Amino acid sequence: WWYGHNAVGFFLTAGFLGMMYYFVPKQAGRPVYSYRLSIVHFWALIAIYMWAGPHHLHYTALPDWAQSLGMVFSLILLAPSWGGAINGVLTLSGVWHKLRTDPILKFLIVSLSFYMMSTFEGPMMSIKTVNSLSHYTDWTIGHVHAGALGWVAMITIGSVYAMLPKLLGREQMFSVKAIDTHFWLHTLGVVFYIASMWIAGVMQGLMWRATNADGTL
């Protein structure tokens, strides 16, 4: 998991944050809210992410000190994660009205909402008492897909929609209405999917707690 969580942290976070820092200001027509914050939270992610992996190994043969260290670093990770997300959202200061008419901007900003949700949920699930309920359940699957389908997929789709007209020499995409429909279908689909996983996961965890050591209720 030292490798596994770095894969999540760098393949599915750092690169897509770079996309966010390019396409959100471009689409909003505004400068990044804070360049200093972008640099600070980037290096904080680099420094902290590698020690978050042990939170996947709570209540296993991993030494208890390593499990606790993974939990602490996961909780610290909340600060740089939300720092980047808030920096992206506040880039819209003064142009919030564009969200009503620009579905590409909706994709980009709602992806940040999913990023904030999954980067809050991850540290929360790393707490040992919470993890004793969530571990090995569908809750974890819901958490991963909030990041994969909510953050990674939506920032990618928004970026592609923003980039294609420029590559093809057009003023805008063929149908803005179709992009808006795509946005709502995707958002509702992800919400229903991850909510069902959360509910199923909590029920699984509670049922396991209801059994005795020999597996009987």
Predicted region positions:
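Hydrophobic cores of alpha-helical transmembrane segments in multi-pass integral membrane proteins
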Residues: 3-27, 36-57, 69-92, 105-128, ...
